[in-house]
Amino acid sequence: MNTHNLLFSFIILFFSCGLKQKLNYSSEFIIPDQKFNNNEVRIDLDYNDEKNWAFRSDMHDFNRLIPKNYNIKNEKKINVSVFFIHPTTLFSSKKWNADTSHFLNNNIIDLCLENQASVFAGITDLYVPHYREMHIYSYTDTINGIKAFNVAYNDIEASFKYFLKNKKTDKFIIASHSQGTNHAKKLINEYIYPKVDLRSKLLMSYLIGMDINKNEMLIDLCQNPVQLNCFLNWRSFNESYY
């Protein structure tokens, strides 16, 4: 394996959400072989269309997300809505962004929801949008990658606007992982923070799987277990993972 492929394989390991059992890392992944083409992603996604949601509490059964041996009946429901942005699942494609066919019967997206968004399932008003995420290779080829990132972010912002209009509670939480955290950072800093009333309703932000310097965020870093209106951030690996 040459240096380029080795770096790409490391990036996949670095940004995946516990997918070691689902992916064959010894295989050669397909990466974009053309420059980013905006003509391929000109049409905006309609978040009134249920197909553009990976999970929504008002249309999906939360039991599909929780561990099969876990009894959620005794859990107290929390009066809060959650907007969860899932991590990268586009590893092998010639396109810089996922298209809507990527949303269909996607076991990797399902696994990410089961491993991560499940903590909110059944006890909150949970929204998880599909979005035209950027290819994992965008972290290597950043010239084309930033353009792909902007497409993905525009979907996130559009879905968040739908979330704001339809969520069942006043207060809300932002939660994200990996690429999702890249989008959450931008959403909080550029869309939520400038709106004082909206900012006051952001109860907590769980920005996981990416390094974040506290100076990168306009909201405060949480300093104690009971602080609200702040963000938590961590990135952890098993010992000797890489």
Describe each region flagged by the PLM.
Residues 1-22:
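Bacterial Sec-dependent N-terminal signal peptides
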Residues 176, 180:
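Gly/Ala-rich beta-loop-alpha elbow adjacent to hydrolase catalytic centers
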Residues 183-187:
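Hydrolases whose catalytic domains are alpha/beta-hydrolase-1, hotdog thioesterase
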Residues 20, 157-168, 190-242:
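Surface cap/lid and interfacial helix-loop subdomains adjacent to catalytic sites
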Residues 17-109, 113:
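Flexible, membrane-associating and regulatory peripheral segments of lipid-active enzymes
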Residues 2, 72-75, 117-120, 195-197, ...:
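A general structural signal for short secondary-structure junctions and capping/turn motifs
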Residues 34-36, 42, 85-171:
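Active-site catalytic motif of lipid deacylating hydrolases and related acyltransferases
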